[in-house]
Amino acid sequence: MSLWLEHFLTGYFQLCGLVCGWSGSRLGRLLSSTFLVLILIELVGEIETYFTEENPDNESVPAYFAKVIMGVNMAYKMIHAWIALSALFECRRFRYLLEELPPVKATSFIYRHLILEIILFACNAFLVLSEYTIRGIYLENLRYAYSLQAVRARYLQMMVLVDRLDGKLEQLHHRVISGSSDYKTLRLDYAHLAKVTRSLSHLFGLSLLLLNVLCLGDWIIVCNVYFMVAYLQVLPATLFLFGQVMFVVCPTLIKIWSICAASHRCVSKSKHLQQQLKDLPGQTPVERSQIEGFALQIMQDPIQIDVCGIYHLNLQTLAGMFFFILEALVIFLQFVSLVRT
């Protein structure tokens, strides 16, 4: 990874409040920690205001759907606050991951997602300015846009580390197929990568679980807007509104698909490495025993990213998530048909 890209990602993640103290100097860590504390104070203030302010007793159906959308927006801020808080306490563990997974050559995968992140930032800025021009609301939309951008950047933060892990697995695979006979060193290197993968799962597991739950929240917003436009007719069916709705749900789906695909590549390379070992011809019984022991180690300790012990990140998980969303949409449409009648 080029130096400018590494510095850009470092600054971007610090600006979003996702990391603490990437800098090696004490002053850099102090400034980063102070910035995180300021973000936490602001977010906690917004959350407290949301739960303590008195809302008017408006029992109309449009008001109910508007409150649901506001609730999902607040969920983004709450998760952003939790990520910033965990960044303060998990600073050393994150630095350990960065040391164990140093920058590698930047791939097209990272550049594509960097471009996507820039596009999301531009769309966020455009929507904030549009809302200010139309309704005169600026600060509240800016706060929500900041939390939305930061929470979605959590996917990119993990994808960078998964891409580095993928590069390490690729190097190990090349050493095996090139004829390296030092199986003891190869086994130690693989065990180290498996340990790093577990650390990666522990650090990002809960975040990924919450972000995947937020994906369902994004679909709730889409369904509520659809209901308010198609049946209650309290919102105009404009192209701008359609663009806002797509901006809510599409980037999240793209990021979930990307992180699942990146994790699936690591799992596939681990299985391919095991198959390559089985196909290697053993010159002596001792060498054959070492090869079989290495293959058994890979089978017993596979490279896979665990999400809070509930599921593993791979393309099968992605398919299950999409089927769950489709079932939820079917239930919603049935509910809409009942309300309409």
UniProtKB/Swiss-Prot annotation:
It is found in: Cell membrane. The chain crosses the membrane at residues 2-22, 31-51, 69-89, 114-134, 203-223, 234-254, 319-339. Pfam families: 7tm_7. Its main location: membrane. GO terms for biological process: chemosensory behavior; detection of chemical stimulus involved in sensory perception of taste; male courtship behavior; monoatomic ion transmembrane transport; signal transduction. One of its GO terms (cellular component) is dendrite. This is Putative gustatory receptor 9a.
